[in-house]
Amino acid sequence: MDEDEKDRAKRASRNKSEKKRRDQFNVLIKELSSMLPGNTRKMDKTTVLEKVIGFLQKHNEVSAQTEICDIQQDWKPSFLSNEEFTQLMLEALDGFIIAVTTDGSIIYVSDSITPLLGHLPSDVMDQNLLNFLPEQEHSEVYKILSSHMLVTDSPSPEYLKSDSDLEFYCHLLRGSLNPKEFPTYEYIKFVGNFRSYNNVPSPSCNGFDNTLSRPCRVPLGKEVCFIATVRLATPQFLKEMCIVDEPLEEFTSRHSLEWKFLFLDHRAPPIIGYLPFEVLGTSGYDYYHIDDLELLARCHQHLMQFGKGKSCCYRFLTKGQQWIWLQTHYYITYHQWNSKPEFIVCTHSVVSYADVRVERRQELALEDPPSEALHSSALKDKGSSLEPRQHFNTLDVGASGLNTSHSPSASSRSSHKSSHTAMSEPTSTPTKLMAEASTPALPRSATLPQELPVPGLSQAATMPAPLPSPSSCDLTQQLLPQTVLQSTPAPMAQFSAQFSMFQTIKDQLEQRTRILQANIRWQQEELHKIQEQLCLVQDSNVQMFLQQPAVSLSFSSTQRPEAQQQLQQRSAAVTQPQLGAGPQLPGQISSAQVTSQHLLRESSVISTQGPKPMRSSQLMQSSGRSGSSLVSPFSSATAALPPSLNLTTPASTSQDASQCQPSPDFSHDRQLRLLLSQPIQPMMPGSCDARQPSEVSRTGRQVKYAQSQTVFQNPDAHPANSSSAPMPVLLMGQAVLHPSFPASQPSPLQPAQARQQPPQHYLQVQAPTSLHSEQQDSLLLSTYSQQPGTLGYPQPPPAQPQPLRPPRRVSSLSESSGLQQPPR
């Protein structure tokens, strides 16, 4: 009994422990089963254990590969992940990663291609690498990519795992906002090797599907790819920031009306890198891209006109020397008291490159072209009109621009963009402007003859001004026609379209040259005519002044030889500046001819009169010389000066003079000539414009000097008790000999025939129309020093002659106003 009870107790405890163990094992199996993927049905314990074992084996293999490929911690910063470190390395090396199949299809490209070449990754994916290369390099690059297939049809794992890198150089096409621009290539370097990958998606519609034959291709599922790092041969110092997704980042700033920074938001430093104190006081145009300055200037003008607006997308230079795309909403704030514009408030938003490209192409009225048209080497046009900022950069590639094949050219973005700066130069040649012009200019070129009028002979009064040189914008609009390049797949059709464009430009240039040559010939003929008229006027002036001494000798036999010599010197001094002067205006020529004719006619008339009219002739000739020497470019109305000298001399006066003085003595003529030879100095030409129009009427008034002038004693004057001596005043406006001061000198010897009141002598000089505002200068005529004992003439008391002013030189008028004073 006791043994049986002991056995039952042991059996019960053993069963209890086994049950506990089985329950614990079932819990673990159930937990493993829940952790396995794809648990759609209930699995037994054996299946669960098999799957767990398989997962552990895979995990061990992956861990081993990760340890091999993982970057060692000794040279990689611990706070950077592998992806971040790879991106930083690519940016520092000016490179990107690309994966290309053996037939040239691009299956992967990193995002760093955008700041380097301007392509979006989505545009490059599933395209063929040969589409981005010049035609001269297609065969060479294709041989490099298919080189491993020539060695063996099925690459061995040892060949694929070899560390021998493959390096080669080529040119890669640059991306641009405008696909119509002439293609530009960048010189790059490929460094990489071949790797095998499974389940690589086959590209579709890349244009090179039939390049390789089916037997030469690697079987599906065992694709071999060329993985390489692409670097620029010429490093870029200014790169475009790669922002593919819209980050919705913005910041505010405040500017003056001249667009200088006055305030910067705290959100700006993480975006542009500048602290507020680094940009305050600087102009916003210092941070903008050179290609966006013209568009931003237009936006600034629009803002100043309307007070608010939105700018276009533009590039802003960050502190890290990268271009970031921004778009600004701005408005002008006004002072609350005087309502004057105070400053400009701007809200800047970050824009992605993809959005900018879509917006620019919409502005250009272009549809998003397919891959063949986007990366084609030929210029293709959809027939839409191009805006002025579209340029044909044909001159940048030289003579190879006419060829459809793309010649390799190592040009960076900075050198490529600097070629557009010639548009802002006003002195650019038409050849350079041809590359920068806008195409819609045929209507302006058709009206070219109307825009260049040739002045006729009716405008001979004024010299024809030289033709104004047209600005760069007008010249380019006249030169370039509106040419539409039809998109043709054949290279010869593309060549013919380009050739027709250059032929049209050549015809426009030849037409412009013919018009300019005709204008030059017309101007030369007009200049020749003016020179002939100048020679005629100068010859007449020489004859006039050579005849003047002979006229004076015919009436004054007592004139001394030294007076004749002084008169000849004076005439030579007047003639020499006129002969040495430059070309004059036609208005001056005509006035000088009329002046010389009137002077010759007056001298011939005066030669038939008595001694007293001789003095009037000398007075008129002196004033005529002064009037002719004061001819200025401002007016041609001085031709009316000599005919307006109305001198009235009665016959009775000349008879009295002949009876009372049988042997006349005209020694006082010399003193009168000396006084009249003083220069009449008007104001400088610059002061003519400074006068108000209301002062013009005052210049013609008569100015009287009541105390400072001496009395002019006329030999034929009536007695002092019933007459007054006339007072001569010579003005630039009007000069009138009028009786205004009584004479107290007795004249008992005056004959009775001369007691009649002689008519007053009026010397009237009309002021020129263009010299109304000149200063009126008066000549103070001293009294005659009459010889004592002369019959019939009163003897005035000896008066001290007024000192003569030294002649002054007026640079703005003729040099004849500065004649030397003859010796006393």
Curated annotation (Swiss-Prot):
Residue numbers spanned by region Disordered: 1-21, 367-437, 556-667, 681-704, 739-824
Biased composition regions of type Basic and acidic residues, renumbered to the chain: 1-10, 378-390
GO biological process: central nervous system development; circadian regulation of gene expression; DNA damage response; positive regulation of behavioral fear response; positive regulation of DNA repair; positive regulation of DNA-templated transcription; regulation of transcription by RNA polymerase II; response to redox state
Bias (Pro residues): 794-805
Annotated bHLH domain residues: 9-59
Pfam families in the record: HLH, PAS, PAS_11
Sample GO molecular function, one term: Hsp90 protein binding
Bias-annotated ranges (Polar residues): 421-431, 587-610, 645-664, 694-704, 766-789
Domain of life of the native organism: Eukaryota
UniProt feature, compositional bias: Low complexity: 559-576, 614-636, 739-760, 809-824
PAS domain boundaries: 82-152, 237-307
Activity regulation, short description: Carbon monoxide (CO) and the redox state of the cell can modulate the transcriptional activity of the NPAS2-BMAL1 heterodimer. NADH and NADPH enhance the DNA-binding activity of the heterodimer whereas CO binds the heme group in NPAS2 and inhibits the DNA-binding activity of the heterodimer.
PANTHER family membership: CIRCADIAN LOCOMOTER OUTPUT CYCLES PROTEIN KAPUT, NEURONAL PAS DOMAIN-CONTAINING PROTEIN 2
Purpose of the protein: Transcriptional activator which forms a core component of the circadian clock. The circadian clock, an internal time-keeping system, regulates various physiological processes through the generation of approximately 24 hour circadian rhythms in gene expression, which are translated into rhythms in metabolism and behavior. It is derived from the Latin roots 'circa' (about) and 'diem' (day) and acts as an important regulator of a wide array of physiological functions including metabolism, sleep, body temperature, blood pressure, endocrine, immune, cardiovascular, and renal function.
Protein name, as recorded: Neuronal PAS domain-containing protein 2
High-level lineage: Eukaryota, Metazoa, Chordata, Craniata, Vertebrata
